[in-house]
C-alpha cells in the first residue's frame, strides 16, 4: 500500500479500527439546550445523553425533532422562560448551551448568569467533543451534511464504529447523531464564527465560496475574506487536512496545515476518482490512492458533487484503516440524509425529489443531478433569506437556466426583515431576459401543488429546492389526492 505523505513533522499515526474516543474527564452534568429542536442542538442532546449526562431543553417551535427527543427521555419545554433555569420542571442545571446568535438579553441566558450557571457556546461544546479523541471535522461552503453522513456511514460499514454529529437525519442511524467507540465525525458549520477557534485530528475541506457573510446575524462574517481566513485557521489547528483538489484556491487556504492530502478527479490528487460512469440513479467509479487502485465504488445519488462527497468518505475511511470493500458497499446502499436529494415518491409517473439546495452552486449541482436522470427537469425553487437573495440573485437565476421548467416561490424570510427591492421576481425576470422559455413567479403555493399534481407525467422529475419549507410542496404533490 502506498505510504501516506510525509511533511516537515511526522504524519499522524493512522488510528486502529477499534480506537475509542477518549471518555470525558468531566462527571455527569445537567445540560440545558436553548433551541433544542434545531438540527444541531438536537444532535448535541442525543450525544450528551448517550454519554451519561442529563439533558433538557426548550424551543419556541416544537415538532418532529423535539418529539423524537422526548421519546428518548429528554424533556423539552415549549417557549423560553427564566423559570426553565431557576425552577422546575428541570431542576438544577449545570451548563446552559446556546448559540452565539442568541441575544444576551434572552431570559434564560440572563437567569443562568444570575444563578451562576455556566453558559457554554454551542461551538465550544463541539470543540470539546472533537478534542476528546480521534476526530474528523468536515468544513466547507457546500456538501458538509452529505459528506459527513457518507463518512460516518462508510466508517460504520467498515467496522470503525464511529460517533457522528450531522446537520441532517441519517436513516442508517435513525437520526442526526450516533455514539460509537471509534472516531468522532462532525459537521462543522461556518455559519457560526466560533468554528474558527476549533480544530480536529483530520479536517475534511470540501470547498469555499461566499455564504453566511454580511447582514445582522451576530455569528455571520463581515467579509468572505474573513470567513476564508476562518477556514484556514481551522485547518492549521487540525492535525491534517484532506481537501478537494478540484476546487480552486483550497491549496492556498490549506498551506498552513501540518499534513496535507487531496481528493478529487484532478490528476495528481492523492485519492482520485477515475473511470467515472454516471447513470440515472447514481454514479459508479474506481478509486485510486496515489496511482494504486483500491477498488470500485458507487454513490446512489446523482451528480458530480456526490462523486466527490463519496470519494472523500472512502478516503477518510482508508486513512483510518477501514476495509475499502466494506466501506464501498455501505456507501452504495446510502441514499442520502434527509433533505439532500430525498426521494419523496411519485405522482403520475413523475419522480418527486426534495433537495436543500439554496445557494447558486448547490442549485446548479442539483439541476445537474436532475439532468443526469434523463428526465424532463421541473424545479420548484424557494429563495432563502432576503440578504442571500440580494447578494446572489443573478447567480441563482443562472444556476436554474438548465432546468426545463422553473417555478419560483416567494422568499423564505427565515426571521429576516424584508429588504426593499429584493423579491423573487429578480430571479424570474433575469431568467426570462436570458431566454428561458418556461419560468414563472408563483406566489400561490396551493396553485403550484394543484398544477404539479395535474401535469405530472412519466419522464418528469419534479425537484423542490431551498432551505425553507418548500419540501412541503413535494410532500403535498406526492400525498395529495388525484
UniProtKB/Swiss-Prot annotation:
Its main location: cytoplasm. ATP binds at residues 140-146. Residues 1-26 are annotated as: Disordered. It comes from the Bacteria. The keyword Transmembrane helix does not apply. NCBIfam families: murC. This is UDP-N-acetylmuramate--L-alanine ligase. It comes from Deinococcus radiodurans (strain ATCC 13939 / DSM 20539 / JCM 16871 / CCUG 27074 / LMG 4051 / NBRC 15346 / NCIMB 9279 / VKM B-1422 / R1).
